[in-house]
């Protein structure tokens, strides 16, 4: 059994004296584990860092075996990612989300969004927006997609500013006004890819919304808590935006 694909390194752990078990999010084969012989060598360690874009070949005698990887560099991002808290927490958060999915289950859209996130870590607001969309996609891929295109009460497709915590459906301003305190906020950029998050408050409200549904449908049923990297990422984005506005 063998295949070749491109991927992003998510994590590495020691295996024996010289080898490493490497976790890669691939384009066509999902999140995949494999052993890299000599993975702890000085030559290989810089390559096997989270965030790096790699060419990966996998081989195993049987499909159910972990198998071995042969990994070659396509682009190095890890050195840049460890320079800022936004990038460091961001790649950790993306990896934590991807580990909610079954291993070897292909998710090309998530892979492509992961690549975009890594490319935009130098813009905290853009990185936050992309990771928010990543969480919305995660809910969809896990079977808990949100319906944010029209009002659950009226069918209107404009002025959607709330989300029902019960149904996960959008609610327009007029229909939601009497129950505003019980509804989740829906910033306009979440629904319209042509719009950008205008400030940190937009991101914070959007992440509160996705966090509610991740907790309800994913973390709590699995007896899990939100990853520390999630709050770390949001705090880092907030600090970076404040610093840029002050300068």
Curated annotation (Swiss-Prot):
It comes from the Bacteria. Keywords: DNA damage, DNA recombination, DNA repair. The keyword DNA damage applies. GO terms for biological process: DNA recombination; double-strand break repair. InterPro entries: ARFGAP/RecO, DNA_rep/recomb_RecO_N, NA-bd_OB-fold, RecO, RecO_C. The keyword DNA damage applies. Belongs to the RecO family. This is DNA repair protein RecO. The lineage of its organism: Bacteria, Pseudomonadati, Pseudomonadota, Alphaproteobacteria, Hyphomicrobiales. The gene is recO.
